[in-house]
Curated annotation (Swiss-Prot):
GO annotation, cellular component aspect: plasma membrane; proton-transporting ATP synthase complex
Gene: atpF
Membrane topology summary: Single-pass membrane protein
An annotated Gene Ontology molecular function: proton-transporting ATPase activity, rotational mechanism
Transmembrane segments: 11-31
Species whose genome carries this gene: Salmonella arizonae (strain ATCC BAA-731 / CDC346-86 / RSK2980)
Function field: F(1)F(0) ATP synthase produces ATP from ADP in the presence of a proton or sodium gradient. F-type ATPases consist of two structural domains, F(1) containing the extramembraneous catalytic core and F(0) containing the membrane proton channel, linked together by a central stalk and a peripheral stalk. During catalysis, ATP synthesis in the catalytic domain of F(1) is coupled via a rotary mechanism of the central stalk subunits to proton translocation. Component of the F(0) channel, it forms part of the peripheral stalk, linking F(1) to F(0).
Lineage: Bacteria, Pseudomonadati, Pseudomonadota, Gammaproteobacteria, Enterobacterales
CDD domains (alphabetical): ATP-synt_Fo_b
Protein name, entry field: ATP synthase subunit b
Compartments where located: Cell inner membrane
Major site of localization recorded for this protein: membrane
Subunit composition and interactions: F-type ATPases have 2 components, F(1) - the catalytic core - and F(0) - the membrane proton channel. F(1) has five subunits: alpha(3), beta(3), gamma(1), delta(1), epsilon(1). F(0) has three main subunits: a(1), b(2) and c(10-14). The alpha and beta chains form an alternating ring which encloses part of the gamma chain. F(1) is attached to F(0) by a central stalk formed by the gamma and epsilon chains, while a peripheral stalk is formed by the delta and b chains.
Annotated keywords: ATP synthesis, Cell inner membrane, Cell membrane, CF(0), Hydrogen ion transport, Ion transport, Membrane, Transmembrane, Transmembrane helix, Transport
Keyword RNA-binding: no
Family: Belongs to the ATPase B chain family.
Length: 156
């Protein structure tokens, strides 16, 4: 029975050891393991959320970039249209100014031509009168002289 008493004593000691471990050692170990599992699960969930947030941020950045490019294209097209409009307005204005200057120059030329004709008529009239005076001085034949004067006046 010695052998049985030893086995029985060892079994009782083992049962007490297991009970002690289950009562005092096992709960803190399980709590530490559960805490660690929770931390790992939270870390994985956080990493997954960060990955999803990164994907959303990439998609948002891509959309914003597309919108910015579209807006830039619209602005460039508007600027090109405005440039063409300004060029057309400048060409039209320059053409109008050119037409105005040409018309003004032609008017000045015509006025100068009229003034020169008038001056020439005055000089011709003075010469005609001087010629008539000389003709009258040389001859007193009025019929011939009046015929000459009439021809001069008709030419003027």
């Amino acid at each position: 029975m010695n052998l049985n008493a030893t086995i029985l004593g060892q079994a009782i000691a083992f049962i007490l050891f297991v009970w002690f471990c289950m009562k005092y050692v096992w709960p803190p170990l399980m709590a530490a393991i559960e805490k660690r599992q929770k931390e790992i699960a939270d870390g994985l969930a956080s990493a997954e959320r960060a990955h999803k947030d990164l994907d959303l941020a990439k998609a948002s950045a891509t959309d914003q970039l597309k919108k910015a490019k579209a807006e830039a294209q619209v602005i460039i097209e508007q600027a090109n249209k405005r440039r063409a409009q300004i060029l057309d307005e400048a060409k039209t204005e320059a053409e109008q100014e050119r037409t105005k200057i040409v018309a003004q120059a032609q008017a000045e030329i015509e006025a100068e031509r009229k003034r020169a004709r008038e001056e020439l008529r005055k000089q011709v009239a003075i010469l005609a009168v001087a010629g008539a005076e000389k003709i009258i001085e040389r001859s007193v034949d009025e019929a011939a002289n009046s015929d000459i004067v009439d021809k001069l006046v008709a030419e003027l």
